[in-house]
UniProtKB/Swiss-Prot annotation:
UniProt gene name: hisB
This protein's GO CC annotations: cytoplasm
The protein, known as: Imidazoleglycerol-phosphate dehydratase
Main location: cytoplasm
Enzyme class, spelled out: lyase
Length: 195
């Protein structure tokens, strides 16, 4: 199984992540932010990856340090799990509807980090999670994973539905991108020869 473990300890957070790309879609652990745990459950299920998180953060301040550092850690674990990226499909995309909401996520595991985030969430928080932290999570993740990531809200009105559709679509797009392409086995999908 392709996987990695990553640990990050700072004055603000203590985080450990175990990631297995060829998993059963299981999330285990707690971030201290209930809604974010729900999102990681969806990400794991739709990405068919196994994700275990241990996290202690300074949530008495707010969720910023915890959420951003989780993005950093997951991005680093993903980069480690992919290694030289030989044989992967590299690209992935998904549209996910949820009632009135429609989200599109497209990504490229190119080694060139860039985030395009075209999402307006009409509420300031869902549960304990400040909604502006969704963008910060994906920015940190894309930077550390070396991922070009586009997230677009095409239709939507309910904050919970929007964030849920984003995490589901990201999981499904990631599942496509990390899949092994039998026609490209042992090769990197780039004319440069590296990603």
């Amino acid at each position: 199984m392709r996987g990695a473990s990553y640990v990050r300890n700072t004055a603000e957070t203590r985080i450990s992540i175990d990631l297995f790309l060829d998993g059963k879609g299981v999330y285990d652990g707690t971030t201290g932010i209930g809604f974010l745990d729900h999102m990681f459950t969806l990400l794991a299920r739709h990405g068919q990856l196994d994700l275990t998180i241990g996290c202690q953060g300074d949530l008495e301040v707010d969720t910023h340090h915890t959420v951003e550092d989780l993005g950093i850690c997951l991005g680093n674990a993903l980069a480690q799990a992919l290694g030289d990226k030989k044989g992967i499909c590299r690209y992935g995309h998904a549209y996910v509807p949820m009632d009135e909401t429609l989200v599109r996520v497209c990504l490229d595991l190119s080694g060139r980090p860039f985030l395009v985030y075209k999402v307006k969430i009409p509420v300031e928080r869902v549960g304990q999670l400040e909604t502006e932290m969704v963008e910060e999570f994906f920015r940190a993740l894309s930077n550390r994973a070396g991922m070009n990531l586009h997230i677009h809200l095409l239709e939507g009105g309910n904050g919970h539905h929007i964030i849920e559709a984003i995490f589901k679509a990201f999981g499904r797009a990631l599942r496509q991108a990390v899949a092994i392409d039998p026609d490209n086995a042992g090769r990197v999908l780039s004319t440069k020869g590296v990603l």
